[in-house]
Swiss-Prot record:
Key word Transmembrane present: yes
InterPro entries with a match to the protein in the record: NADH_UbQ_OxRdtase_chain4L/K, NUOK/Mnh_C1-like
Entry keywords, A to Z: Membrane, NAD, NADP, Plastoquinone, Quinone, Thylakoid, Translocase, Transmembrane, Transmembrane helix, Transport
Family: Belongs to the complex I subunit 4L family.
Subcellular location: Cellular thylakoid membrane
Membrane topology note: Multi-pass membrane protein
Name under which the protein is recorded: NAD(P)H-quinone oxidoreductase subunit 4L
Organism of provenance: Nostoc sp. (strain PCC 7120 / SAG 25.82 / UTEX 2576)
EC number: 7.1.1.-
Catalytic activity, reaction form: a plastoquinone + NADH + (n+1) H(+)(in) = a plastoquinol + NAD(+) + n H(+)(out); a plastoquinone + NADPH + (n+1) H(+)(in) = a plastoquinol + NADP(+) + n H(+)(out)
Lineage: Bacteria, Bacillati, Cyanobacteriota, Cyanophyceae, Nostocales
Matches recorded under NCBIfam families: PRK05715.1-2, PRK05715.1-3, PRK05715.1-4, PRK05715.1-5
Principal subcellular localisation of the protein: membrane
Database matches in Gene3D superfamilies: 1.10.287.3510
Domain of life: Bacteria
Length: 101
């Protein structure tokens, strides 16, 4: 396949992630939107790695690193959301004013 198809798919994923990040008030949806953004970046890394030099695996190694960081981010983010839900009984981003007394 040509590079432009991968780039178009990655751009579409990135735009969907940005839209979800901007419009969503639910904390879990925000985390899912961030994961979409990271997957768009992974798709770009893999596409450019294959397009520029398919014998080197630098893009694949960096993609595995990004997937690992994304998994850790999701685990920490969900733990924070769960802790806030237990205290506030909501996952609405407007209600996350924890710095107020």
């Amino acid at each position: 396949m040509q590079l432009r198809y991968f780039l178009l798919l990655a751009a579409a994923l990135f735009c969907i992630g940005i839209y979800g990040l901007i419009t969503s008030r639910n904390a879990v949806r925000v985390l899912m939107s961030i994961e979409l953004l990271l997957n768009a970046v992974n798709l770009n890394l893999m596409a450019f790695s294959n397009y520029l030099d398919s014998t080197l695996i630098k893009g694949q190694v960096f993609t595995v690193f990004v997937i690992t960081v994304a998994a850790a981010e999701a685990a920490v983010g969900l733990a924070i959301v769960l802790a806030i839900y237990r205290n506030r009984d909501t996952v609405d981003m407007e209600q996350f004013n924890l710095l107020k007394w």
